[in-house]
């Protein structure tokens, strides 16, 4: 039986989302809509913080512990950041802002429910809740062909991944007679149903994580979606899906023979993401391929035992979120900021904004003393201690290779005189600067990250 008090943050978020939707629908005041949505997420964060560190709760449907609490708070912080980015986008300050904000809040509810799910059916319902919202958000600019294409492509391929996930649930149910993760702990021997269930599950989740070879949707969707939505797509679903994948992997006590599959998907994602990013002149497409590569790095953590998995993956997820959100805040400060060529001379015009993108790109590459270096070093060290030297060497080569495309925007900052306008969005400026400073701070004080 569920004790609903452990789900108060999610329940409050859903109720407040509905209230803000009807209020916004009546008033049609975009400013009020964004304020109400911000307060809704803030309320959920406060309630989650009050529950943080409390006794672990487990039922057949829901499980709450320290790392799940951390991830649900992280998702909510992403929501706050996205509300700020969306508020500065003139195209989202319209009569449709009510629907936009409601879909955003609904997707946050689904993601947090997915993180705490302890049952495959709850997981599936949660995934569909946030996926359906994201399909609409990706195509929210209905007058722009790229946005419509992004929404349709994401919807069609996302539906396929949902079908694969249902297949995974069937295999697990056929073996255990239940969809609860708790029954997975009772399994004594590995068999074909369990192995196929895990493989189908990884395949379905690999789509949401944009892992190769399930990555084809990412560049077009990232480019066509509104920039604030792209920032959301590149971060929040990864936190939710990686959280769910951790939950399932830790629930299955069997030693599954899928290490080779994890190695292949990780290596292929790093290779595809880094090599194809080198050809991109559109920064949103470049960050799409970057997210494929980083998903590959993070997926390697599933080769590790429980403790090392958590202390490797959770800090990486936190840093990855701040790197990406800060990068998109920077993009939204430059007129036509998707094109790298438009950064010519920005370094001379706005040194503070240039400092932000330099720190962000260094952190994405993994250059010390940024937090990006700390989490990569921590992951590689743990993998080395368990005998994955060849994979770590390949990942290190890919990290070095990534410098060639991450540093291209930095090169353009000081190449010529300014040829494009810089928007003066105080909110975006402060978010980009806060993210950059946080990446340096966590790089200098890594113990704050490695608390798991």
Swiss-Prot record:
Major place of residence: membrane
In Gene Ontology terms, what is one molecular function of this protein? Answer: NADH dehydrogenase (ubiquinone) activity
Please give, as recorded in its UniProt entry, the membrane topology of this protein.
Multi-pass membrane protein
Q: Which domain of life is it from?
A: Bacteria
Per the UniProt record, which EC number(s) apply here? Answer: 7.1.1.-
Biological process (GO) annotations held by this record are: ATP synthesis coupled electron transport
Query: Which cellular compartments is it found in?
Result: Cell inner membrane
Q: Which reaction does it catalyse?
A: a quinone + NADH + 5 H(+)(in) = a quinol + NAD(+) + 4 H(+)(out)
- InterPro entries, sorted: NADH-Q_OxRdtase_suN/2 (IPR010096), ND/Mrp_TM (IPR001750)
Q: Name one Pfam family in it.
A: Proton_antipo_M
Keyword Heme part of the UniProt annotation: no
- The UniProt transmembrane annotation reads 6-26, 33-53, 70-90, 97-117, 120-140, 154-174, 194-214, 232-252, 258-278, 286-306, 311-331, 355-375, 387-407, 432-452
Q: Which GO terms describe its cellular component?
A: plasma membrane
How this chain assembles, per its entry, is: NDH-1 is composed of 14 different subunits. Subunits NuoA, H, J, K, L, M, N constitute the membrane sector of the complex.
Which family does the record claim for this protein? Answer: Belongs to the complex I subunit 2 family.
Q: What does this protein do?
A: NDH-1 shuttles electrons from NADH, via FMN and iron-sulfur (Fe-S) centers, to quinones in the respiratory chain. The immediate electron acceptor for the enzyme in this species is believed to be ubiquinone. Couples the redox reaction to proton translocation (for every two electrons transferred, four hydrogen ions are translocated across the cytoplasmic membrane), and thus conserves the redox energy in a proton gradient.
Protein name per UniProt: NADH-quinone oxidoreductase subunit N 2
């Amino acid at each position: 039986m569920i004790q609903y008090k452990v789900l108060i943050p999610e329940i409050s978020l859903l109720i407040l989302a509905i209230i803000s939707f009807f209020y916004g629908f009546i008033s049609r005041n975009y400013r009020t809509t964004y304020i109400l949505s911000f307060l809704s997420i803030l309320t959920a964060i406060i309630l989650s913080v009050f529950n943080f560190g409390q006794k672990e709760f487990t039922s057949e449907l829901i499980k709450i512990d320290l790392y799940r609490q951390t991830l649900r708070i992280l998702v909510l912080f992403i929501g706050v950041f996205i509300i700020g980015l969306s508020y500065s986008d003139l195209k989202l300050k319209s009569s449709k802002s009510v629907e936009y904000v409601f879909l955003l809040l609904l997707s946050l509810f689904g993601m947090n429910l997915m993180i705490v799910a302890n049952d495959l059916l709850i997981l599936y319902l949660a995934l569909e809740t946030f996926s359906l919202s994201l399909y609409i958000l990706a195509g929210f600019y209905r007058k722009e062909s790229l946005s419509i294409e992004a929404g349709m492509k994401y919807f069609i391929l996302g539906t396929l991944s949902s079908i694969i996930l249902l297949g995974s649930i069937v295999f697990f149910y056929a073996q255990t007679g239940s969809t609860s993760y708790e029954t997975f702990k009772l399994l004594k021997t590995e068999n074909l149903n369990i192995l196929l269930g895990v493989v189908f599950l990884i395949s379905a989740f690999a789509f949401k994580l944009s892992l190769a070879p399930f990555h084809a949707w990412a560049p077009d969707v990232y480019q066509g979606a509104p920039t604030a939505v792209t920032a959301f797509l590149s971060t929040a679903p990864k936190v939710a899906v990686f959280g769910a994948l951790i939950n399932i992997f830790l629930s299955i006590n069997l030693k599954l023979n899928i290490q080779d599959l994890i190695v292949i998907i990780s290596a292929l994602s790093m290779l595809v993401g880094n090599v194809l990013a080198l050809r991109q002149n559109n920064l949103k497409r470049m960050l799409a391929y970057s997210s494929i590569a980083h998903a590959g790095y993070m997926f390697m953590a599933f080769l590790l035992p429980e403790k090392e998995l958590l202390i490797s993956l959770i800090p990486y997820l936190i840093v990855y979120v701040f790197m990406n959100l800060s990068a998109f805040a920077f993009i939204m400060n430059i007129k036509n900021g998707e094109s790298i060529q438009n950064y010519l001379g920005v370094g001379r015009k706005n040194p503070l904004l240039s400092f932000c993108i330099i720190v962000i790109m260094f952190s994405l590459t993994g250059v010390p003393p940024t937090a990006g270096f700390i989490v990569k070093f921590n992951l590689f060290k743990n993998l080395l201690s368990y005998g994955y030297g060849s994979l770590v060497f390949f990942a290190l080569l890919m990290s070095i290779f990534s410098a060639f495309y991450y540093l291209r925007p930095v090169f353009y900052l000081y190449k010529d005189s300014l040829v494009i306008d810089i928007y003066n969005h105080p909110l975006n400026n402060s978010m980009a600067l806060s993210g950059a400073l946080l990446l340096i701070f966590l790089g200098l004080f890594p113990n704050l990250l490695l608390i798991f």
